[in-house]
A protein has these predicted regions:
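A short, surface-exposed loop/turn module that caps and links secondary-structure elements
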Residues: 29-54
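Enriched for short, Lys/Arg-rich terminal
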Residues: 2-6, 10, 16-17, 21-24, ...
């Protein structure tokens, strides 16, 4: 199954600031998202439908729209910072 990957501005801003090796690792993990490795659904009512992908010390927050086969990356950040927002 082929998914379309959409990276929102908030996540893109964080990713472009990463050093090259980390940026490549995070982007590689994002484009492998549909296969799913270290993926968990976020807890809490306000986080319904949001998932997190762990990439080293970084977390990628995303949602999946199976009707349209879209993975939408909504945010990314350091572990401590990202969980304060979600």
């Amino acid at each position: 199954m082929k998914y379309t990957i959409v990276i929102e501005k908030l996540a893109e801003k964080f990713i472009v600031k990463l050093p090259k090796p980390e940026k490549e690792r995070v982007l590689k993990a994002i484009y492998q998202l549909p296969e799913g490795n270290d993926i968990k659904e976020l807890k809490g009512k306000k986080n319904k439908g949001l998932y997190r992908l762990r990439v080293s010390d970084y977390r990628v927050i995303y949602t999946i729209d199976n009707g349209k086969l879209i993975v939408c990356v909504v945010d990314a950040g350091n572990r401590g910072d990202i969980y304060k927002r979600y």
